Amino acid sequence: MAKITGNLVATGLKFGIVTARFNDFINDKLLSGAIDTLVRHGAYENDIDTAWVPGAFEIPLVAKKMANSGKYDAVICLGTVIRGSTTHYDYVCNEAAKGIGAVALETGVPVIFGVLTTENIEQAIERAGTKAGNKGSECALGAIEIVNVLKAI
């Protein structure tokens, strides 16, 4: 029985990153964590393109455009949605998650879900480089690994 695994070497790989501007004080940290991790694992900065969109709801469309371009081995999607007092949070979270997942399945390109969906600002800050780590960095590791798993199949 063969065991297929992916290594964490990003040398020679190209990445697209889509980041939401809404809650940019959090998303800037997620983006920095993702880029730092990709570079530490061998990616060159000129092999990483970033696109900014208004909010998490708009991420899937740009992710699909990047995935369909043929330029990228993986696309990383970063954003932050913080629950408010209305149901808007639920709609944005659900549609962003569905859309990002659909892009990966439709294109065959790894598309990583790095949209924080938190109950409050404190949880978002914790996941952007403080006590709960940096989810942007974790998404970058996931992107590298899944690209290499697919190459090994």
From Swiss-Prot:
Catalytic site: 88 (proton donor)
Subunit structure: Forms an icosahedral capsid composed of 60 subunits, arranged as a dodecamer of pentamers.
UniProt binding sites for (2S)-2-hydroxy-3-oxobutyl phosphate: 85-86, 127
Entry EC number(s): 2.5.1.78
SUPFAM superfamilies: Lumazine synthase
Catalytic activity: (2S)-2-hydroxy-3-oxobutyl phosphate + 5-amino-6-(D-ribitylamino)uracil = 6,7-dimethyl-8-(1-D-ribityl)lumazine + phosphate + 2 H2O + H(+)
GO terms for cellular component: cytosol; riboflavin synthase complex
Binding site for 5-amino-6-(D-ribitylamino)uracil: 22, 56-58, 80-82, 113
Name assigned to this protein: 6,7-dimethyl-8-ribityllumazine synthase
Top EC class of this enzyme: transferase
GO terms classed as biological process: riboflavin biosynthetic process
Organism: Actinobacillus pleuropneumoniae
Keywords linked to the UniProt accession: Riboflavin biosynthesis, Transferase
Family indicated by similarity: Belongs to the DMRL synthase family.
Function summary: Catalyzes the formation of 6,7-dimethyl-8-ribityllumazine by condensation of 5-amino-6-(D-ribitylamino)uracil with 3,4-dihydroxy-2-butanone 4-phosphate. This is the penultimate step in the biosynthesis of riboflavin.
Pathway where it operates: Cofactor biosynthesis; riboflavin biosynthesis; riboflavin from 2-hydroxy-3-oxobutyl phosphate and 5-amino-6-(D-ribitylamino)uracil: step 1/2
GO molecular-function terms, A-Z: 6,7-dimethyl-8-ribityllumazine synthase activity
